[in-house]
Amino acid sequence: MSAIDELQALIVELKSELEAQKTETRQQQAQAQQARQRIDRMSAEVVDSNPYSRLMALQRMNIVKDYERIREKTVAVVGVGGVGSVTADMLTRCGIGKLILFDYDKVELANMNRLFFTPDQAGLSKVEAAARTLTFINPDVKIETHNYNITTVDNFDNFLTTISQSGTEPGTPVDLILSCVDNFEARMAINAACNEHSLNWFESGVSENAVSGHIQFIRPGDTACFACAPPLVVAENIDERTLKREGVCAASLPTTMGITAGFLVQNALKYLLNFGEVSDYLGYNALNDFFPKMTLKPNPQCDDRHCLLRQKEFQTKPKPVKKEVEIVAEEPLHATNEWGIELVAEDAPATEDADEPKPIVSDIGEGLRLAYEAPSKSTETTSEATTTTTGDETSLDDLMAQMKSM
């Protein structure tokens, strides 16, 4: 067989594999549609068939004012690796409106220790495999994938256009960008794009030894951007795939990555739904369970010109005025005191009947009962006195006589 025949046979084989892959994709998409129909509105009804009942309970508990607003939000996740895949999974389960995924790597068996992918997805692009799984988990979420490296010139322009015009409404920017990449060059690309369009974003990462991680909330002009305080040591012009071929490999723990992803999504939800306090910087050290928090101020000599521009804009903005809290005199919560509860100062002198227990209220409410009734002080005293008196009435001689007669 000639070389041409071998190539033609290889082409036929690859075409058959491609058709089989397309068929499998269509089957999985049909299976995802059969899993459940799309839900138009989130409901707080507590039934087994409602996937949002536990999320909507946050409203009932006054944690979130309107949880369903999450369907109006668009989040971009850059990097679908150890942290990014878990982040995308959590956001999908939370019911985010639209999820945009960026990555150019493929799923490998070496990823199985930390990603939510399955071994049968090895060889697929990470964004494609993630989209399949996430669509099956929650078909209500709109998922958009981009399989390219954002650090190249052409792809950076595409990335810039996507994050600035692919919001929930066409032509609007995304609501939040989550950086889950593992290299300096990609972080700087995200930083430059967000500074240029003044977009808030979270940076995240896990250390090379897999025992520490962090998240950082970056608001251009208000907090330090990634270029304001870059790492002390940076490896430049090195492709990660080259390091893999040379046997260089960083450690990874699914626990550390899961914790970091949890912190990332938790703060993203607080930012998107306006509840709680969003951490500007939150670290995690697994060796001693240390969680440092801090706020990093922008560098007035930052190398990023857009960062300097955002700093000037922020300085000219009027400072938010803190609302004065009006002190209102507290009124009694209950008009009646059914249980006879009284507050006594610690230094109050003891009264004569301080040791006398209060009478037990038998009627404590419908559906409740007392397990037992404690004896009163007077009853205990009478019982002790009776026992003592009974012992004194019988003399020792009488007891001896009774024993001899037995």
Curated annotation (Swiss-Prot):
Q: What cellular component terms from Gene Ontology apply here? A: cytosol
Gene3D superfamilies from the xrefs?
NAD(P)-binding Rossmann-like Domain (3.40.50.720)
Q: A single GO molecular function, which one?
A: UFM1 activating enzyme activity
- Annotated region described as Disordered, given as residue ranges: 373-397
CDD domains associated with the record: ThiF_MoeB_HesA_family
Q: Where does ATP bind?
A: 82, 103, 126, 149, 183
Q: Which UniProt keywords apply?
A: ATP-binding, Metal-binding, Nucleotide-binding, Ubl conjugation pathway, Zinc
The name this protein carries in UniProt is: Ubiquitin-like modifier-activating enzyme 5
